[in-house]
């Protein structure tokens, strides 16, 4: 009967289709995957809005329905070179409203749905607001001009010691303040 649980016992690693039938009639279907480590087969989705009133449970339900085990948090950071420096609420570089509490609520809800949360971060992107601080670490073209992207993002040498120390510390703050389990490190 509906509402009762069924135990499959111990299953070997692999993917399984599950059908709920009443005689020859299929009432519902789903799938499951058994793995020692979900990183072996990442099923990846993304989130791109973090307004204070976001329905995080709806996102978690969709992640569960689609069997996602990893979710990238795209465009969540305050600035490319200052990921969590904007306080609890701010506008991202594209002027979208961000609530860090919404980010944290999403991370918790997605964890309950079986998904790990990965913050997006640009490995060597610096916005115009922070460029003066980092222009000594600029990645230069052959003609001596700095590389840039779209007029809003400057490119620094990812091996520059000061940048690397800053970037690693910024990622650590994201783990401590947000709860991310990892990062999608973009290289453009």
Regions found by a protein language model. Give the residues of each.
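Beta-strand-enriched, solvent-exposed domains that form extended recognition/catalytic surfaces
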Residues: 1-37
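Short, well-ordered coil/turn segments that N-cap beta-strands
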Residues: 67-69, 111-117, 179-181
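An acidic-aromatic substrate-binding cleft motif
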Residues: 27-79
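Active-site-adjacent "subsite" loops/lids of carbohydrate-active enzymes
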Residues: 38-39, 48-52, 119-178
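A general structural detector for well-ordered alpha-helical segments in enzyme core domains, enriched
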Residues: 58-62, 99-106, 170, 174
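Active-site-proximal loop/short-helix segments
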Residues: 78-81, 85-88, 133, 179-188
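Aromatic-lined substrate-binding rim segments of carbohydrate-active enzymes
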Residues: 77-127
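A cross-family glycoside hydrolase active-site/sugar-binding cleft signature
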Residues: 45-48, 72-74, 118-122, 184-186
């Amino acid at each position: 009967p509906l509402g009762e649980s069924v135990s499959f016992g111990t299953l070997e690693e692999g993917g399984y289709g599950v059908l709920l039938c009443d005689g020859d009639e299929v009432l519902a279907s789903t799938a499951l995957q058994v793995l020692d480590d979900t990183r072996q087969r990442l099923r990846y989705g993304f989130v791109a809005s973090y307004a204070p009133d976001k329905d995080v449970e709806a996102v978690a339900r969709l992640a569960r329905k689609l069997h996602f085990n990893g979710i990238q948090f795209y465009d969540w950071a305050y600035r490319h070179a200052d990921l969590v420096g904007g306080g609890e609420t701010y506008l991202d570089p594209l002027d979208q409203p961000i609530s860090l509490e919404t980010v944290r609520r999403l991370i918790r809800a997605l964890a309950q749905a079986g998904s790990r949360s990965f913050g997006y971060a640009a490995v060597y992107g610096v916005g115009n607001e922070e460029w003066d601080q980092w222009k000594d670490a600029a990645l230069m073209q052959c003609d001596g001009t700095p590389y840039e992207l779209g007029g809003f993002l400057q490119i620094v040498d990812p091996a520059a010691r000061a940048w690397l120390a800053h970037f690693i510390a910024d990622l650590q703050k994201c783990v401590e303040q947000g709860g991310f389990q990892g990062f999608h490190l973009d290289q453009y």
